[in-house]
Amino acid sequence: FSGPVENVAMYANSEYCTPLQGFIDADSQGWPELESTWEAIRTAYCDNEGNQVGYPVGYSYPGIYYNADMLAEAGIDPKEIKSFNDLYDACVKLVEGGYTTYGVGFHPDGFYFNAALGREGLQAYNNNNGLGSERITECLYTKDTKVHDAIYNMLDVYQKLHAEKLCVAYGSDYQAEVIPQMASGDCAMFMGVVSMTTKILDAANGAFEVGIIPMISATEA
């Protein structure tokens, strides 16, 4: 399966698919490559009894694509963009320096929100963010100081970027909304997933070097 948990659930007990667990049990040599996969991903592809119902192919990993030529011209080292605060500083320099119209493009999706927290080993909700058999029952924003401070800092940066017109939001139609802006030079960076790589390279068409930064953290921690 490739997709979110709810997509897997639609097929897990249908007559169209055979549960993968039987094949796993028959494999006497084990599945070492799966054992090294992030445990939360594995859990998301199991039923409530812990039996695996699918293999998570095509899983998305987030990062920030950037116009390497533009950042170099602005004197910005992409390796130093490690947090939301660093991203804000880079956007200020890019926009106020006249290098581009928008510093970064954002997709306001919880996936990126949780990924930024995950860079610091934090989760916004209890019970492993609901990835196991136990459902989420509590938001940790008001219960855990580290979670509160990380979320507050991240949302504060979001707010400043929008208020100061340093960023542009995009939705699910990223190929029409943000990739053309980056290809034209109107946007220096955008937050996306690795599956977007070919599309941005095709859009840039060699006009500039495209780079990608691993997902940044919510704070400087």
Task: Give, region by region, the residue ranges found by the protein language model.
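Short, solvent-exposed loop/beta-turn-alpha elements that line the ligand-binding surface or hinge
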Residues: Q21-T37, E80, L122-N153, D202-A203, ...
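Extracytoplasmic/periplasmic solute-binding protein
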Residues: A44-V57, P62, Y88-L140, C187
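Aromatic-glycine-rich donor-binding/catalytic loop that engages nucleotide-sugar donors
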Residues: D69-E80, A163-E164
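A conserved catalytic-core signature of glycosyltransferases
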Residues: Y59-Y61, Y66, E177
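Hinge/lid segment of periplasmic solute-binding proteins
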Residues: V5-P62, Y88, I213
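Glycine-centered hinge/linker elements that transmit conformational signals in sensory
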Residues: D89-K93, S133-G171
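Stable alpha-helical elements in mature extracytoplasmic
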Residues: P4-N7, Y16, L20, N67, ...
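Extracytoplasmic/periplasmic substrate-binding proteins
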Residues: F1, E6-M10, A115, Y152-A221
